[in-house]
Design a protein with these regions (language model features):
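N-terminally biased helix-coil "hinge/interface" segments that flank
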Residues: 1-398
């Protein structure tokens, strides 16, 4: 009997589950910490979860006929600002240069109240797209700080050839790149440009992750194609995430909604999932997930997805201080900061603690709260710890 495996790479934990293909019966499940800081990135935790699942259940690799991945890597990259600066190349006919320039120009993109995506803009006349001119433009954008390219041409949905020329040159220069026509066939130059920029900003992270995943799982003897879930509940080969990374922005939440529909048989309901890094809230209506176009802050995109609100606050979110007063929570989590939760540490280790502040990652504000002991060991201050300290968590739960 065939086995299907689902693996979810979250911001804090990576989960793997096996079910029988015919009946849908649960065979086994495992949870391991997500390995952000490993040389292989989150792929190491994914492989650890997969290997542990096979060991715990005794499933032979040859019985597996499908492996589907879901991930919050893309949405967490946006929430936490772990994105690549983008160079936007606008293209338009000389006769409409001023209009096309204005509609493709993006100064920066607000990702969260505190984080913006750096964007650098350049414009090319459609009549002057020589390889040399395009290459010079891309090198100039790189010199300004761009690490990925988004190209968006007026009338690109009708004639994508100008965008393809820029993509070819970007590839030759080793730059990850996205074109507006790849993101949508809909009209709306501004929205296509923004969506392409967001996609380009997470291409480096997703390309690295997918490469490590493919290489790592190949060593296990797995012969079936690896698939990934998109935000609209579609499933495609994993290599699609290298090109259309933004389509996986709500991959994790979409998988959760699909699970709720499959196992709870809901007709109408509100779906809430609290993870370690982010919290998802979605709606199920008449037995179907509500669908809409994704918005990033106040920015509309071309990405159609399940209607899920993602908040950068969850069980592992770090508390932030202004002076001695609470200033906020998140988006950084204890896992990203590499700090243990005090409520899971033996009480005898938690003595002579003092409150300090720190920056979880280079470039972060130094206003995240932590506890430090006399030996310099530090512990996170998270919502999970606060709930336990306040007695809100029943004995035996966590």
């Amino acid at each position: 009997m065939g086995i299907r495996v689902g693996i979810d790479v979250g911001g804090t934990f990576t989960k793997a589950v096996a079910i029988e293909s015919a009946s849908g019966a649960l065979v086994g499940k495992v949870t391991v910490p997500t390995t952000h800081h490993a040389p292989e990135g989150v792929a190491r935790g994914l492989v650890e979860a997969f290997s542990s699942l096979l060991q715990r259940t005794g499933i032979a690799v040859g019985r597996i006929d499908l492996v589907v991945l879901s991930t919050t890597q893309a949405v967490n990259a946006l929430l936490e600002g772990d994105v690549a600066p983008v160079g936007v190349v606008g293209i338009g006919p000389r006769a409409h240069r001023k209009e096309a320039f204005r509609r493709t120009r993006i100064d920066s993109v607000q990702l969260t109240p505190e984080r913006r995506l750096p964007v650098f803009h350049a414009f090319l006349d459609a009549e002057e797209l020589s390889e040399e001119r395009v290459a010079d433009t891309l090198r100039t954008l790189m010199a300004r700080g761009a690490r990925a390219i988004a190209v968006s041409a007026a009338y690109g949905v009708e004639d994508p050839e100008p965008e393809r020329r820029v993509l070819d040159v970007a590839t030759a220069l080793g730059l990850p790149a996205t074109a507006g026509h790849e993101m949508s066939g809909l009209y709306g130059l501004e929205v296509r440009t923004l969506t392409a920029a967001v996609n380009a900003s997470i291409l480096p992270r997703m390309a690295e992750t997918t490469r490590w995943v493919e290489q790592s799982l190949a060593t296990s003897g797995l012969q079936v194609p690896l698939m990934i879930m998109h935000g609209d509940l579609a499933v495609s080969p994993l290599e699609e995430a290298r090109r259309l990374a933004a389509s996986t922005i709500l991959s994790g939440p979409a998988a959760s909604v699909a699970g709720a529909l499959l196992y709870h048989k809901l007709l109408d309901g509100l779906f809430i999932e609290v993870g370690g890094t982010s919290t998802n809230v979605g709606v199920i209506r008449q037995g179907r997930p509500v669908m809409k176009y994704v918005r990033i802050m106040d920015h509309p995109t071309c990405l159609r997805s399940v209607d899920v609100r993602v908040a950068g606050v969850a069980g592992g979110s770090l508390v932030r201080l202004r002076g001695r007063k609470l200033a906020g929570v998140g988006p950084r989590s204890a896992h990203i900061a590499g700090l243990p939760y005090p409520c899971f540490v033996p009480p005898e280790m938690l003595s002579n603690l003092r409150l300090v502040t720190l920056a979880p990652r280079p470039g972060d504000p130094e206003d995240y709260a932590a506890l430090e002991d006399d030996e310099g060991r530090r512990y996170a201050v998270t919502l999970t710890d606060a709930a336990n300290a306040l007695g809100l968590v029943p004995e035996g739960d966590y």
